[in-house]
Amino acid sequence: MNFRRCWLRLTARNSNFNGRPAAFKALWSHADDVTLSGGFGGTIERGWEQVGRRLDWVGAQFSKGTNTIERIAANTSGDLGYLVQIEHLRFQVAGQTKESTRTYRVTMLFRREPEGWRIIHRQADSNVTKQAPQ
């Protein structure tokens, strides 16, 4: 699979915001060197066991969600690739009826594996507005 087709499949991630993380988890490498620095903060997860558990937890937080993506940059060199994007989320917290929104800056790294391109790192944060130090 070419790299562009891989990142187009990231739209499968919308199911993650509806309590079904399996499609997004399938885009990840299941190797011991994957890392996740998620938008909810906390520790940086290392290795597929920790990352997979965190993705399950994240999926359980959402219902009725959508994710609109603004792609900023994407490229590859050899067996590595990267993707930089802004993600605009609309969702309900699981068990609640009020709609919420969040916007994240996201950087993902990919590696070409025998099964195709897989995510090996994702970093997301909500610092989308420039702020001077205080």
Predicted regions and their residues:
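Short, low-complexity N-terminal intrinsically disordered segments enriched in polar/charged residues
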Residues: 1-27, 79, 131-134
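A solvent-exposed, acidic/Ser-Thr-rich amphipathic alpha-helical stretch
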Residues: 21-78, 86, 100
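Generic alpha-helical structural signal
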Residues: 4-11, 49-52, 56, 105
